[in-house]
């Protein structure tokens, strides 16, 4: 039963944080497309790890966008706390998720190999 509740809380946080990043965080350093890929809230509801994927051409822009998100984590926590009714609002920890970039890289390698075999 608790596992089901944890999943609902994770999805609710993911939806709210995605909405906040897209519509309410007003930082000029946020220039790339940002997607929240996963949220994992601890069982005691003290911490929420937010995994984001940042789509940009260069690593410097990606680093600046991640830093801007980390600086906005206090605002995100406050806003999520106002929208989701919990006893404690978890501390937001933002992590970069490179799984999509890694998958695209692997797909590119597979396509190169298949073209070489033809």
Swiss-Prot record:
Domain of life of the organism encoding this protein:
Bacteria
Q: Name one GO biological process term.
A: maturation of SSU-rRNA
Q: Where primarily located?
A: cytoplasm
A single GO molecular-function term is: ribosomal small subunit binding
The keyword Flavoprotein appears for this protein: no
Q: Describe the family membership recorded for this protein in Swiss-Prot or TrEMBL.
A: Belongs to the RbfA family.
User: So what does this one do?
Assistant: One of several proteins that assist in the late maturation steps of the functional core of the 30S ribosomal subunit. Associates with free 30S ribosomal subunits (but not with 30S subunits that are part of 70S ribosomes or polysomes). Required for efficient processing of 16S rRNA. May interact with the 5'-terminal helix region of 16S rRNA.
Q: What is this protein called?
A: Ribosome-binding factor A
Q: From what organism does this protein derive?
A: Clostridium beijerinckii (strain ATCC 51743 / NCIMB 8052) (Clostridium acetobutylicum)
